[in-house]
Design a protein with these regions (language model features):
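WD40-repeat beta-propeller superdomains and closely related acidic/aromatic-rich repeat-like regions
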Residues: 1-131
């Protein structure tokens, strides 16, 4: 599960294990069924949801997406980092389209559960499962 907030705190977006990308209005804490349309002009303060048009290229062809454990966008909006079940941290340009070639780095013996860019995007941190 992941949650992102917009820069003006009007909207929140979330995803879950049921592969749903949901949008919520912060003023009344209600789900917005038209959120995909209503949030087109919105700038997101964070980028951690693993479903959406800007992350569609993180899933290799022929996979169901369950191996991607976490996504994190850089603060400058240029990069996406993913952690997966194979111990890899994969770095993509943001937005990530299908057929974009990422850079993959092995740093864990087990699955990578989360990635996080430092405040100035100079460092990328990753958290492993059972390392």
């Amino acid at each position: 599960m992941a949650i992102d907030f917009c820069t003006h705190n009007n909207y929140l977006r979330s995803n879950c294990g049921a592969y749903e990308l949901l949008f919520w209005t912060m003023s009344d804490c209600q789900q917005d069924p038209s959120g995909k349309t209503n949030t087109k002009p919105v700038v997101w303060a964070t980028s951690t949801v693993k479903f959406g048009w800007n992350v569609e290229g993180i899933y290799p062809k022929g996979t169901d997406g369950t191996h991607i454990n976490g996504v994190c966008g850089s603060h400058d909006g240029q990069l996406l980092a993913c952690g997966d079940d194979y111990g890899l941290v994969t770095l993509f340009r943001d937005p990530c389209r299908a057929k974009h070639v990422p850079r993959a780095y092995r740093g864990h013996s087990e699955h990578v559960v989360r990635t996080l860019f430092g405040d100035d995007d100079q460092y990328l941190y990753s958290i492993g499962g059972y390392d």
